[in-house]
């Protein structure tokens, strides 16, 4: 079962890469042929893949861990990497997940609306000239509170930026609401069953 295998790999990555401040970033790319590609180098704040390993390949999964103390959401650098891979044709929007594993839980992004996502990637790749970077900075400067609040604030950033992305989130046992524990939640901030009513603002 692919879902069980993914969950097991995420759990292993979490215990290996998220419970120490001295751990380095780690993760993998899974290709459409089922091949797993692992980083050629990594530090506590960065990891890179060999261009020859990914050349001409389509990705179905791209998962990486932020070591202890790292954020529970993708950094702007992560969003640039995601946008670059899409721009270079590595991503089939209908069959792709991008995930960040942290000590707080796992956040997975899926592409819900490709035309909107395509425009978002162009804005992200515009860097300082784009709105996405400014809106991410606004989010980052104000983010705080509980795990749920920060997840909510990140989703508000995605919505404000018209990203075309949807979020799935699974908190670690030690964080988040008890009823969430160990369960994947699809978070649609436009619905009344969202994290909390503030997410709809």
Stretches found by the model and what they are:
Residues 46-61, 65-201:
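Active-site-proximal loop/helix of nucleotide/amide-processing enzymes and allied scaffolds
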Residues 8-21, 25-30:
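N-terminal, Lys/Arg-enriched amphipathic/low-complexity engagement segments
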Residues 24-33, 97-101:
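Short beta-strand scaffold segments in enzyme catalytic cores
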Residues 1-5:
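Non-catalytic propeptide/linker segments at domain boundaries
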Residues 35-48:
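N-terminal carbohydrate-binding/catalytic regions of secreted carbohydrate-active enzymes
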């Amino acid at each position: 079962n692919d879902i069980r295998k993914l969950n097991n790999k995420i759990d292993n990555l979490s215990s290996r890469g998220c419970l120490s401040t001295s751990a380095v970033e780690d993760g993998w790319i899974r290709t459409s042929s089922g091949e797993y590609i692992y980083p050629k180098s990594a530090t506590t704040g960065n990891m890179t893949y060999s261009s020859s390993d990914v050349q001409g390949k389509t990705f179905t999964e791209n998962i990486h861990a932020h070591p202890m103390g790292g954020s529970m959401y993708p950094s702007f650098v992560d969003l640039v990497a995601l946008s670059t891979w899409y721009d270079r044709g590595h991503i089939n929007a209908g069959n792709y997940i991008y995930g960040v594993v942290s000590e707080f839980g796992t956040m997975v992004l899926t592409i819900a609306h490709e035309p909107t996502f395509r425009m978002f990637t162009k804005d992200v790749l515009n860097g300082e000239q784009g709105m996405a970077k400014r809106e991410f900075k606004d989010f980052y400067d104000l983010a705080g509170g509980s795990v749920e609040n920060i997840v909510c604030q990140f989703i508000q950033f995605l919505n404000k930026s018209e990203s075309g992305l949807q979020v799935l989130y699974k908190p670690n046992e030690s964080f988040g609401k008890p009823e969430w524990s160990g369960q994947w939640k699809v978070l649609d901030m436009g619905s009344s069953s969202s994290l909390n009513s503030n997410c709809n603002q």
